Design a protein with these regions (language model features):
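Conserved phosphate-binding elements of NTP-dependent enzyme cores
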Residues: 1-938
Length: 938
């Protein structure tokens, strides 16, 4: 087997015919500036070729279902093992997916509860029992010796009906007595009960005096009772009037409540056997939100106070409301706030009494008719039958999702929660953090019987191993019940990493995309140990990463550069960490200290105003009061899971969105907020793509393309031909090439081979038709402009202020190497974020804007971080406020104000440890962030 992976002539995206040799069974880090070609090399070349080779092993029949993969633009790759990519993307949007299901710990947990749990009565709380027929006979002989008893089988439990047919059937079988609603009565011919009342009927199978001599008769009658009662029976003591229940199933001996024997599906919220019937195992229910249905109570019905109904129209709906108003003393012109509680409830939820409505205006038959007003809620609810996205979206805007009122968010049936292991049910265990769960599972065997211990031994071993892997990658603060949809990209990636470590595969090539995302410096060492564990098992590990600790731990480093875009795509250095230090790359400059991000000499005083949130207690926050001083660069820090996102993204952001834009986003619980009046705009800048289609590009997103098209409209050529600005858009008919619809390429389907993209034969890849391309400005047509880099375009349009200003903003954020027409889907997360920031830079602001960024350094090299900080500082220097959630110490150390949350993740976090300057935080002994800042000399 080869000891290296050899790549020859890689030309994917901006790679410049790269030849590279990477050692196998080593930890390899690929680093370089954002946009330099790291992901192109790791994912779009190595991983893509590995996947393509796997697909080629499938039959042509199978390939038509799973699709085929495009061959990457590379001459040859040798020494390639089976490839597994662990990316940042949170692809799982399934509401049923949780940390427990993804890691498969839930499967083992369900097995543990099915085989080694104890059931407890939901009525009395006593342990439920499980007997064989012989054991039941012994219990009856021992407990009722010498007494006269009746053996009874329950046949009807709390149901309405006359049951004449049942009594006739029992009489034909020779049964004489039954206990009906607590009274033993003789079964007579034609016997029937009140059909509208609820009844409980127990069949008297036998009456006997208990003695050892009567054991045979007792066994015969007991078996018949079990047959008639479907595994359940009762013994009635004539002397005391008391009864006791027995079952072949689990049963409460005092009340007779019985459960079926548990199976793994009993504890699965994805199975009808275990899922809560009210929420179908989702743990939450949709309820109508009055604030969304009636957003402004000062408006009248005629003015459109009820959002789903809209403004007054002369139709049957408003005619019914008018008649309803006569009954509840309101008119269509009264503000909703003046309605009585009964009147508002009638409007929203309907009225039981029919309304008399004159239909002459709405129907040719006319006349007065009785109509039932069903209410606005029913009107909205009818769209449940509308499967269209539009119908569902319309309905969902009036709903809010709350914890299920029946299962309390556990997702399971009540019966499943009566089974306990070491005193906890499966929902309670799933709600523990992984660290707490690991502590509980370490001692659980001590509370088990010998039999339970033998059954659970192997199951517990598997669970413990998986928990250890999750803790090793820094996810001890998560719970198994945590929805996968709520995980960040970094958390999802580390969960998949833990799962892969647990799979114990060997000779696999793993490719990871910045696994340190969202991880505090404190947890970095454990993550590196996990990657080393993968490597030491005989696997090759390639990591796209910028973290210095990760580089120091690597066996081999590949530095891609020297710059980004067209100025990147080459291997500027490769080898050990020491080899990289000796190179003259930008990465080496930062690692050696030749370049650094300097700590500012002084901090901004701010405006003196602040936003204060009091009593924030969402998720794990402990009723904290957080102050955000305005006019400053604020960094919210803390270990993973401490509560940073809860405070900023789930509390502060929705509060501001509701106040400024009447957003429907609901903040997590808090007591009060003050200072919102000091800001007039909220901007959230994330790393999501600037568009979902390849047609979106830097020119369209920054809106500079509109100005460029208007400029082309004003050229003499366009004026003569009568071309308007729309003629120069490749998204609409008119100026674009209709053969390729403005894409520049045509797709040729190859059935069992990957689709082939060829340059459009009509336009030659220029996107536009010949007439449009004949229009020129300064000798360049519209396609030439789209193929310019931003740097070239800044010079080309220097005399057009509206265009130059927007392009200069893109250049200032370090993206001058991008072409104006570069598809948005090919941009990295860091590039997308900086495009968005450039759009903000080019706008005029009032100096009262609040910017929120969540981990903006994701995917950024040291040099990219310097450029990002330059942009953020410009925004703050204008008087605006920037709040970032961040772990990167280069960002933290230059902030004006820090809010450090902790001390740990999960339940052990949620407190504001210290707030102040980086120097203040460095002096806090409880703060992990402070510890690392202190090591930097603060």
């Amino acid at each position: 087997m080869e000891d290296t992976i050899k790549i020859y002539g890689a030309r994917v995206h901006n790679l410049k015919n790269v030849d590279l040799e990477i050692p196998r069974r080593k930890l390899v880090v690929i680093t370089g500036l954002s946009g330099s070609g790291k992901s192109s090399l790791a994912f779009d070349t190595i991983y893509a070729e590995g996947q393509r080779r796997y697909m080629e092993t499938l039959s042509t029949y199978a390939r038509q279902f799973v699709g085929t993969m495009e061959r990457p633009d590379v001459d040859k790759i040798t020494g390639l093992s089976p490839v597994v990519a662990i990316e940042q993307k949170t692809t799982n949007k399934n509401p049923r997916s949780t940390v427990g299901t993804v890691t498969e710990i839930n499967d083992f947990l369900r097995l543990l509860y099915a085989r080694a749990s104890r059931a407890y009565s939901p009525v009395t709380g006593e342990e439920m029992v499980h007997y064989s027929d012989d054991q039941i006979a012994d219990l009856i002989l021992g407990g009722f010796d010498g007494r006269r008893i009746a053996l009874m089988a329950p046949v009807v439990k709390g149901r309405k009906g006359h049951y004449r047919e049942l009594f006739e059937s029992l009489a034909r079988k020779g049964y004489i007595y039954a206990r009906i609603d607590g009274e033993i009565r003789e079964i007579t011919a034609g016997m029937r009960l009140d059909r509208y009342k609820i009844h409980t009927i127990d069949l008297v199978v036998d009456r006997l005096q208990v003695s050892a001599d009567a054991r045979d008769r007792l066994m015969t009658s007991l078996k018949e009772s079990m047959r008639q009662g479907k595994g359940t029976m009762a013994v009635y003591d004539y002397g005391t009037g008391q009864q006791r229940f027995y079952s072949r199933h689990l049963m409460c001996p005092s009340t007779g409540v019985a459960f079926e024997d548990p199976a793994p599906h009993t504890f699965s919220f994805n199975s009808p056997k275990g899922a809560c019937p009210h929420c179908n195992g989702l743990g939450e229910e949709a309820v109508f939100d009055l604030a969304k249905i009636v957003p402004d109570p000062q408006l009248s019905l005629r003015e459109g106070a009820v959002e789903p109904l809209g403004k007054y129209r002369n139709n049957l709906l408003f005619a019914e409301l008018e008649m309803l108003g006569r009954r509840y003393d309101f008119t269509l012109d009264d503000p909703i706030s003046s309605f009585s509680e009964e009147g508002l409830n009638a409007v929203l939820y309907g009225d039981s009494e029919p309304l008399t409505v004159d239909l002459s205006e709405f129907s040719s038959s006319g006349g007065r008719q009785f109509l039932q007003w069903e209410g606005v809620a029913e009107y909205i609810g009818r769209t449940e039958d509308d499967d269209s996205k539009r119908g569902q979206k319309w309905r969902d805007q009036f709903l809010v999702y709350r914890t299920c009122s029946v299962c309390g968010g556990s997702r399971l049936k009540k019966e499943a929660l009566q089974f306990r292991v070491a005193g906890k049910n499966i929902a309670e265990v799933s709600a523990l953090s992984i660290s707490e769960f690991a502590g509980w599972i370490a001692t659980v065997e001590e509370q088990m019987s010998d039999k339970e211990r033998r059954i659970a031994q192997e199951i517990l071993k598997e669970i413990r191993e998986r928990l250890r892997f999750l803790q090793d990658v820094g996810l001890g603060y998560l719970s198994l019940a945590r929805s996968s949809r709520s995980l960040s990209g970094g958390e999802s990636q580390r969960i998949r990493l833990a799962t892969q470590i647990g799979s114990k595969l060997v000779n696999v090539l793993y490719i990871l995309d910045e696994p340190s995302i969202g991880l505090h410096q404190r947890d970095n060492r454990r993550l590196i140990r996990s990657l080393e564990e993968l490597r030491d098992a005989g696997n090759s590990v390639i990591v796209v990463e910028h973290d210095e600790d990760m580089m120091r731990a690597a066996d081999f480093i590949v530095d891609v550069g020297p710059r980004a875009g067209r100025k990147g795509g080459r291997i500027v250095a490769s080898g050990s960490f020491d080899d990289i230090l000796r190179s003259d790359s930008i990465t080496a400059d930062y690692l050696t200290g030749r370049r650094r991000i300097e700590i500012p000499a002084s901090l901004r005083p701010g405006t003196g105003e602040r936003i204060v949130i009091r009593g924030a207690r969402g998720n794990n926050l402990k009723g904290v009061t957080a102050e955000f001083p305005l006019g400053k660069f604020i960094c919210v820090t803390g270990v993973s899971g401490s509560g940073k996102s809860t405070l900023v993204n789930e509390t502060l952001r929705p509060i501001l969105s509701k106040a400024l834009y009447r957003s429907y986003d609901q903040p997590l619980p808090y007591d009060s907020v003050e200072g919102i009046e000091h800001i007039d705009k909220l901007v959230v800048v994330d790393q999501s793509p600037i568009g979902r289609s390849p047609r979106s590009n830097p020119a369209t997103y920054s809106n500079v393309f509109s100005d460029i098209r208007k400029l082309f409209e004003m050229t003499p050529d366009a004026q003569i031909r009568g071309f308007k600005a729309g003629r120069f858009s490749f998204n609409v008919k008119g100026g674009r090439c209709e053969e390729c619809r403005g894409a520049g390429v045509q797709t040729i389907e190859m059935n069992f081979l990957p689709d082939v993209y060829v340059r459009c034969r009509a336009c030659g890849g220029h996107r536009y038709n010949r007439e449009t391309l004949e229009v020129r400005y300064k000798g360049r047509n519209i396609d030439d402009v789209l193929n310019m880099t931003v740097n070239m375009a800044v010079e080309f349009f220097e005399n057009i202020p509206s265009i130059h200003q927007k392009l200069r903003a893109i250049q200032e954020v370090g993206l001058g190497y991008l072409t104006l027409g570069q598809p948005g889907t090919t941009l990295s997360g860091g590039e997308s974020q900086r495009i968005k920031l450039s759009a903000e830079l080019s706008k005029r602001d009032t100096g009262r804007t609040l910017y929120i960024l969540d981990e903006p350094t994701t995917g950024l090299h040291f040099e990219d971080i310097r450029l990002l900080l330059d942009v953020l500082n410009k925004l703050v220097d204008r008087g605006n406020t920037v709040i970032v959630i961040e772990h990167n110490l280069d960002v933290i150390k230059v902030a004006d104000h820090l809010i450090d949350i902790g001390p740990e993740g999960g339940a052990a976090g949620g407190r504001i440890l210290v707030a102040g300057t980086p120097h203040d935080v460095a002096q806090c002994p409880e703060s992990y962030t402070g510890l690392f800042l202190k090591q930097m000399g603060l």
